[in-house]
């Protein structure tokens, strides 16, 4: 789908003080949604256990790792957990499981002793006593040594380990091999001129920290109603906008499963109505994607399905308005994008450690759990991926802008203070 063209008109003064309308044409781009993988048409999870997901993942990733370890350690034999022999070096492939002392358990909520020992609810569940286990269909073995750090890995990762069984029955890890970045389609940077994609996250319309004026400044900048002719020329180069989740915040206490009074129903719908007004202004001139987030009125489990169209009576009138899944995948002028609203990274932050969010994102690529193939992380085979972490707009007033010509990024910062 091609983004709609928009004209900006403003008066230009000549020496004879005659007003002349100057037109600025918004640039076009070619958009294609690739959300079919995440679009659930029918119920598919009924009666399934999590173990089936792990076994399916292990089967897929093990086949891949078997083909790669022959180049990694060609002279070291590959065996299963059950086939380990004490002191004999080998390679085992399996799913990591992380034993965590502070990890919450649903049974703790119903424990008889819970009143005597309060539940621990930290933001991070790391503990010095945490350890890793590797599991395949034949069994599981505790991992030892200093090569494999429990603080880096989480449950669910599939890796190949070089090591040997100790007298205590543990597996002493000597080296670790991860799948690495997936084979990449040839990056096609078709654009020879500057075209920009704007990413916004955590607008949180309706929250106590949301600043309507700050959001309106963003909308006015995108639509070309802010600034002089130079600013409007920059706005005309914006060809796509992505709202990456948590666009609204419903007042707490209203969604408790009870029948709502008419006054409460109005409070419940006000944030969505306000968001629709702003999105309508943007969709009138540029293509817009809106993804659901953890605070939005959508299903909770991933993949989250698109928000209901009935929530946006104004925006849905434009064919430039796209309701998307989370994760969301699309192509724009030959560049492929894959992103989430952040739940996967938030979970990694609870159960492991890293310098920043970008390092967590890089790990998902190396583990191939969520591996985009769009173009600065460099793989061993020359793969190039641009990682973008978008801050919460209602707290920072910052949006992220990507140039389709060279994949360079910069930020847009909006500030607004109310006078007392």
Set out the residue ranges of the language-model regions.
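Extended recognition/assembly regions associated with phosphoester-bond processing machinery
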Residues: 1-420
């Amino acid at each position: 789908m091609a983004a709609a063209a928009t004209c900006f008109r403003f008066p230009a003064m000549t020496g004879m003080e005659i007003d002349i309308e100057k037109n600025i044409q918004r640039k076009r781009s070619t958009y294609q949604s690739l959300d079919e993988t995440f679009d659930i048409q029918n119920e598919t999870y009924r009666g399934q256990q999590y173990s089936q997901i792990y076994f399916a993942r292990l089967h897929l990733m093990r086949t891949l790792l078997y083909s790669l370890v022959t180049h990694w350690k060609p002279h070291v034999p590959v065996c299963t957990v059950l086939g380990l022999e004490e002191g004999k070096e080998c390679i085992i492939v399996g799913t990591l499981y992380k034993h965590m002392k502070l990890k919450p358990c649903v049974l703790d909520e119903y424990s008889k002793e819970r009143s005597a020992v309060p539940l621990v609810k930290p933001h991070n569940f790391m503990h010095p006593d945490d350890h890793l286990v590797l599991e395949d269909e034949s069994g599981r073995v505790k991992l030892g040594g200093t090569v494999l750090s429990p603080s880096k890995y989480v449950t669910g990762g599939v890796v190949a380990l070089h090591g040997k069984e100790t007298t205590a029955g543990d597996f002493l890890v000597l080296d670790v091999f991860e799948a690495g970045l997936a084979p990449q389609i040839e990056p096609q940077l078709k654009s020879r001129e500057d075209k920009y994609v704007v990413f916004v996250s955590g607008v949180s319309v309706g929250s106590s920290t949301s600043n309507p004026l700050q959001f309106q400044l963003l909308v006015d900048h995108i639509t070309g109603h802010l600034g002089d002719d130079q600013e409007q020329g920059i706005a005309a180069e914006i060809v796509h906008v992505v709202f990456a989740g948590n666009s609204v915040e419903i007042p707490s206490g209203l969604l408790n499963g009870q029948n709502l009074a008419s006054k409460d129903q109005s409070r419940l719908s006000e944030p969505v109505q306000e968001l629709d007004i702003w999105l309508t202004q943007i969709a009138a001139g540029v293509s817009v994607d809106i993804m659901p987030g953890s605070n939005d009125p959508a299903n909770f489990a991933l993949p989250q399905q698109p928000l209901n169209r009935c929530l946006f009576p104004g925006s849905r009138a434009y064919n430039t308005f796209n309701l998307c899944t989370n994760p969301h995948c699309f192509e724009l002028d030959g560049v492929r994008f894959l992103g989430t609203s952040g739940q996967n990274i938030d979970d990694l932050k609870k159960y492991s450690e890293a310098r920043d969010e970008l390092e967590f994102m890089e790990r998902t690529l190396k583990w191939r759990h969520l591996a985009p193939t769009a173009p600065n992380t460099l793989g061993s085979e020359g793969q190039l991926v641009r990682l973008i972490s978008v801050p919460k707009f209602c707290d920072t007033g910052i949006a992220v802008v990507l140039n389709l010509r060279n994949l360079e990024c910069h930020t847009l910062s909006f500030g607004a203070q109310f006078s007392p």
